[in-house]
Amino acid sequence: MSDETVFQAAYDQVLRNWPDGVTAIDVPTPYGSTRVHVCGPEDGTPLVLLPGGGTTSMAWYANAAALAAAHRVYAVDLIGDYGRSVHDGAPLRGAGDLTAWLDALFDELDLDGAHLAGHSYGAWIALNHALHAPHRLGRLALLDPVQCFARMSPRYLLRAALTTLKPAAERPGALHRWESGRDPEDPVWRAFLAGTAAAKRSKVVTMPRPREDALRACPVPTLVCLAGKSRAHDAPRVAAAARRLMPRAEVVTLPDASHHSLPTERPAELNRLLVDFFA
């Protein structure tokens, strides 16, 4: 099989772990076609899920069933990143283009009033969208959000840069092992991450931190869920900044989670938090 075929096969293998009845749709936007996986009751409150960079909508496989029990779940492959979205339209130059892309997605799917959750890079996109269009959202959940309330760890950024010097097939696993202290527990997910070494992405937008005055003014009810063992940033520092900048937000820490273990590994506690928050 070609390298791209290996990645697509691994993607399909993870998809088999999703709830019965999950549907894949391709949504047109000015930036290109966006792949969205949909499940849950048609009359449920919509819940949009944005994954961390390089993980695709498949990252939510361990959460989809719990979240789809009462919500219409829309799990998105980020435009410009790995997955089955096709970035063949307007260029992605900055955060404004990602909010415009998400606006177009909300328009096409009639998602006004939807809840929104994101992990890592997806959390940064989600927060920027909440600041841009708070009237479009119900509630917002940010899972170990990077570049939202405090800077990323220079050591993490250096390790990520050094990882690019390794053979392509070793890169995803090397960063996960360093950050989490082990390989992914699920062999199917482990194979998927290895497969991303062969995947293609067009553009991952750089991540300026939001303005503090904008964060303080954000009216969207927000959950900030941090990984206590995250090496992407200093979790206590992020928690303190989140409480200072968004005093109405609920800020919790999962003490045994790492940045890269979210949202896939040992998901029971995370699922309970999200289900309760979005209820």
Question: Each predicted region: which residue ranges?
Answer:
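Conserved alpha/beta-hydrolase "nucleophile elbow" surrounding the catalytic nucleophile
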Residues: 51-53, 114, 118-123
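Alpha/beta-hydrolase fold catalytic core
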Residues: 1-47, 70-71, 111-112, 272, ...
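Conserved alpha/beta-hydrolase catalytic His-Asp/Glu region
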Residues: 151-156, 166-220
